[in-house]
Amino acid sequence: MSAPMIGMVVLVVVLGLAVLALSYRLWKLRQGGTAGIMRDIPAVGGHGWRHGVIRYRGGEAAFYRLSSLRLWPDRRLSRRGVEIISRRAPRGDEFDIMTDEIVVVELCDSTQDRRVGYEIALDRGALTAFLSWLESRPSPRARRRSM
């Protein structure tokens, strides 16, 4: 085989892997979930928002960004570590990507001794689903009884 032929084979293999990864990601996004917009805080103005899908599974909410090619979730929120800090309406240039029906919730994830802040923008139905999932967590005072 000549060098150009080897280069073409490598290029075809790389493109094939990219298509497989993209297909897998799109398949994961189409499996369902709740539409949401999320960003890490602190953030400046209306910057940093990413559209995606939130999927709930047991004690974890996984956020898949629409524009990401990762095979795993972009953010994971543990139900035991998430605290709601505040709620607000969109403001300023956030209205470019949100409507007045959206509620922005500021969260703090204190899982594993790390303090990470997020903001999630959800419509009223998605907010109800998120709050129901969050409020159904076991009480921190609840202990498993050993026999």
UniProtKB/Swiss-Prot annotation:
The record's subcellular location field reads: Membrane
By sequence similarity, the record places it as follows: To M.leprae ML1147.
Its topology with respect to the membrane?
A: Single-pass membrane protein
Q: Which InterPro entries match?
A: DUF2550
What name does this protein carry? Answer: Uncharacterized protein MT1352
Q: Which GO terms describe its cellular component?
A: membrane
Q: Which organism is it from?
A: Mycobacterium tuberculosis (strain CDC 1551 / Oshkosh)
Main localization (coarse): membrane
